[in-house]
Amino acid sequence: MFSWALVFLIFALVAGVLGFTGLAGTASSIAWILFVVGLIVSLIFLVAGRRPTV
């Protein structure tokens, strides 16, 4: 998930440098959403992995 966020971030930076501002804005929004989703999923797995032993 984080690798896709990084890909879209790099894509947004390149598009912004080349002047495609609408495309850069869309790609940066996608990168931000993927980063947040990846962070939430990571936290869920971190909490779910700490089950007490019986």
Swiss-Prot record:
Where is the protein situated, by its record's location annotation?
Cell membrane
Q: Where are the transmembrane segments?
A: 4-24, 29-49
Q: How does it sit in the membrane?
A: Multi-pass membrane protein
One of the record's GO cellular component terms: plasma membrane
- Has UniProt tagged this entry with the keyword Repeat? no
- Which keywords does UniProt give here? Cell membrane, Membrane, Transmembrane, Transmembrane helix
Pfam families cross-referenced by the UniProt entry: DUF1328
Q: What is its main location?
A: membrane
Protein family according to the UniProt entry: Belongs to the UPF0391 family.
Q: What is the protein name for this chain?
A: UPF0391 membrane protein TERTU_3637
Annotated source species: Teredinibacter turnerae (strain ATCC 39867 / T7901)
